Amino acid sequence: EDNDPLKVEGLGTVESNGDMINSIKNDKYGIGYISMSSLEDSGLKGLYYEGVEPTEENVLKETYTLTRNFNYIIRSEYENIEKEQIIDAFLAYLGTQEGKTTMQSEGGILEVKASDPTWDSIKDNYAITLEDNSDITINFGGSTSVSKMAQSLADELSDLCGNVNFSHNYHGSSDAYK
């Protein structure tokens, strides 16, 4: 279906946070959205929403509510059980202290708690991680906003999961994997 008739005159689309930053800087009346991790060095001003300043602390306290989550989506069916087990291990890794620390270091806004499991405390639940998985490739794609985070997580998990390979293909939030 053609949505062009619904677009407002002057509306533009961009491919990345960097493109959005440049577009807004070059448009006196521009407004857009970027990842909060990109805001600090952008030279742009974050929008106060309902009187609350856009800070990581306020996002974590849930007082700044003009936010969006990044969601991983996975297949409902797999070509083999090994890929399913590796994805299960990856999803578990996301909830560990190590996984959360990596997400945080790549601009993710989340808390790492002492009560979060460590990878060492849960890895025995994922026997696939003890096998040689160097002949298996898992595909990642989606938003360029999380590409560095996903690449860092995949690099870590590859080392922890029998050298499984990860293929990265990012185009934007709406594209998923191409």
Features from the language model and the residues they span:
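Exported/periplasmic ABC-transporter solute-binding proteins
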Residues: 1-178
